[in-house]
Amino acid sequence: MKVRNSLRSLKSRHRDCRVVRRKGRVYVINKTQRKFKARQG
């Protein structure tokens, strides 16, 4: 999982990327290509 300051560029890397909030943190998840996971931090 990558940790990035901004997730704007990461959510456009793949069409299945979704931005979700969990426990006060913002994540990018991808069900089909799991290598695109990221967390904002």
From Swiss-Prot:
GO cellular component: ribonucleoprotein complex; ribosome
Keyword S-adenosyl-L-methionine: no
Coiled-coil spans in chain: none
Residues spanning the membrane: none
Molecular function per GO: structural constituent of ribosome
Pfam family name, one: Ribosomal_L36
Keyword RNA-binding tagged: no
Organism superkingdom: Bacteria
Family statement drawn from the similarity comment of this UniProt entry: Belongs to the bacterial ribosomal protein bL36 family.
HAMAP family: Ribosomal_bL36 (MF_00251)
Protein name as annotated: Large ribosomal subunit protein bL36
Species whose genome carries this gene: Ruegeria pomeroyi (strain ATCC 700808 / DSM 15171 / DSS-3)
